[in-house]
């Protein structure tokens, strides 16, 4: 090797190899996407980001990362030649060549360290950019058309969407890049080191027949055989890792629920029940972990045995030629180094099978997330149209997720400013009707006409966002749209004047305010927004009858043009509404 020309030679080698790698890698991705299920899953989240129509930058960035990977391969090839020359100088007691090799080692080491640092930065930059893009895509898909709500009512419930967006996205991107660069590094190195080993390997006599370069065939046969066994041992890890993700997410969610419903659990003294449920879920996690551990012991144990054998395997083959003085110590050491590299590259697919198992589980969770959203969005046959003033139901039929009819062929017209009270037995479909109007319920068909862009829903347990009280009052709009004076005036109207001095305080208002106060805060929000239609789902259930009467009177005074549709059980609500819709058994209904 002419070290004086090595920089130019290496540059040419990297450019040529980069061109070949780009073509082969692209064709390989095409075949995977076309003919494998996991390839199609991979492309669901990579195709949009890597598309030149969106931006050419990701592809250029990836090519730069591949170029740095090839630079590392080239440095390792130069390092192999350095091994040979350094050990040969030791065998021949050539001090001049030895120190020359030490100087060369400094150059090789500096190049290797620099390449590693630059590669790390480029890879992390690429990963972060991809995570940002993919996170935005999935969050938008989850929030669009209220899919975050609809997916809760699918027959195959979408578990832990938070983990799929936050954790699985990062795992997918990082593993995709590491596997891609790993494959490129392994294949490129394998070809390069095979050429080197071909020149180093001597002939061997097998059953009386001399076979040239026998070591090359032996190492390939050895690795292929061990890889097949490793795949057989590691295959169950794919499903086990998927189950592990689900069990851990469910356990974590149960812990969060205890914090969320701490007061209710405390009132019921339900600690024993909750603790037993936690132990059951935790035991399931531990059991699955032990199954993974025992499977990994078999898989990793086999890999470790294979790795130990590979240390002495080339030595046993080449030592005869060394003792016969057919090769020098430098050649022997280079053979060991080249064999080790070639074995590692050939074993890449075997040793990373457990990583691929986790990767496949991540792909299944992410694609399951997207399929659930598509199913939730495509299921509804309800046609919801905008109407400037009125609320009109035409042949509206609603079912529960099991297919039982709750409401059949509902036909009602509510002119602007009308108030309607919906009553019926528990489970009759009162709240479900409101969900259908809002476009949240997929198990319905028919036609709804209403002011679709000017609605507000008040639930029994109002949503109070994080932040100060001013933000909670303005939600879902920005707090900058209302003045302090206006906010104080509205709080006084809903009998929450004692909170006026705390409008700018950031606290956990859900825990500070009673449920009745939260409901009055929701009424203040309703008066502030002045919607064309207001839907009240037992929005006064935590108020006494006097407060309830005051709140509805306030709505009539402040929002005379707003159509009010309420759900409630109290008989006192009847006098506060102009019409009643009674939901009866078997989908029947009656308007009073």
UniProtKB/Swiss-Prot annotation:
Q: Where would I find the ABC transporter domain in this sequence?
A: 391-592
Transmembrane annotation, as ranges: 12-32, 58-78, 102-122, 191-211, 214-234, 299-319
**Where, per UniProt, does this protein localize?**
Cell inner membrane
Q: How does it sit in the membrane?
A: Multi-pass membrane protein
Gene3D superfamilies reported for this sequence: ABC transporter type 1, transmembrane domain (1.20.1560.10), P-loop containing nucleotide triphosphate hydrolases (3.40.50.300)
List the record's Gene Ontology CC terms alphabetically.
plasma membrane
- Segments forming domain ABC transmembrane type-1: 58-358
Q: Identify the residues that bind ATP.
A: 424-431
Q: Name one Pfam family in it.
A: ABC_tran
Its predominant location is membrane
Q: Which UniProt keywords apply?
A: ATP-binding, Cell inner membrane, Cell membrane, Membrane, Nucleotide-binding, Transmembrane, Transmembrane helix, Transport
* InterPro entries membership: AAA+_ATPase (IPR003593), ABC1_TM_dom (IPR011527), ABC1_TM_sf (IPR036640), ABC_transporter-like_ATP-bd (IPR003439), ABC_transporter-like_CS (IPR017871), ABC_transporter_sub-D (IPR050835), P-loop_NTPase (IPR027417)
PANTHER family in UniProt: ATP-BINDING CASSETTE, SUB-FAMILY D MEMBER, LYSOSOMAL COBALAMIN TRANSPORTER ABCD4
Record's protein name: Uncharacterized ABC transporter ATP-binding protein HI_0036
- Name the source organism: Haemophilus influenzae (strain ATCC 51907 / DSM 11121 / KW20 / Rd)
